[in-house]
A protein has these predicted regions:
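Compact alpha/beta protein-protein interaction domains typified by the UBC
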Residues: 1-133
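Domain-scale recognition of soluble eukaryotic interaction modules
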Residues: 106-207
């Protein structure tokens, strides 16, 4: 209160993207409708982003035989925590994070260690059959579309992972079962936070 006994409005501060989402969650819980998935971490009129915790998933490779021993290989391997983002322009991004905690706007991002992903994190979709819409109800379909596709070649030709022998050697060892738990030390720091990436939608969109 001020000296006259009236209320005083203090200086405010801009809301972060995550603060907006928390407010939206609070308001939507008071209304009838569908549930908000726990893995949804951001949504506005231009994009939606969600988190996939670290865990075991099958991955598929179709590469030259001299790179992964066989032309086609598929194994269940460990994966790091991931954040996916799809924009209304259907630009699709993926970034890696360390640990198993739900990401916040201050969470540091790392390069997703996968083939067919550009430096910005944008996924090269090729002929992947994508869901028609990017909505909260479709998150599992988008995640499955990523992991059920063939990984064919690195779009980042150096520094995809920090691993002796490079990306092909890394994934050959992963497929051979040499790392039961995903080796987070191999992830390349992108020197940016999740909040920064979501504000810029990946900084640039690769064609």
């Amino acid at each position: 209160a001020n000296q006259g006994g009236g209320a005083t409005i203090l200086p405010g501060r801009p809301m972060t993207a995550f603060a907006v989402l928390r407010l939206a969650r609070s308001l939507m819980k008071r209304q009838d409708g569908g549930f908000i998935p726990d893995r949804l971490i951001f949504q506005d009129s231009a994009a939606i982003a969600w988190w996939v915790p670290p865990g075991m998933r099958r991955i598929w490779f179709r590469c030259p035989e001299d790179q992964l021993v066989a032309g086609e290989r598929s194994e269940v391997v460990s994966h790091p925590g991931l954040v996916f983002c799809v924009t209304t322009a259907r630009k699709w991004f993926v970034w890696a994070i360390k640990g198993a905690a739900r990401p916040k706007d201050s969470t540091r991002l790392f390069r997703a260690p996968y083939f067919n992903v550009w430096e910005s994190g944008q996924i090269c979709v090729g002929n992947v059959d994508l869901p028609e819409r990017a909505t909260a109800e479709k998150l599992d379909e988008w995640t499955s579309a990523f992991f059920d596709s063939w990984f064919t070649h690195p779009n980042v030709h150096s520094n995809l992972v920090r691993y002796r022998g490079g990306a092909y050697r890394f994934w050959r060892d992963m497929l051979d079962g040499k790392h039961v738990v995903f080796p987070e030390r191999t992830l390349v720091d992108l020197d940016r936070t999740l909040g920064e990436a979501l504000q810029s939608r990946g900084a640039k969109h690769d064609n």
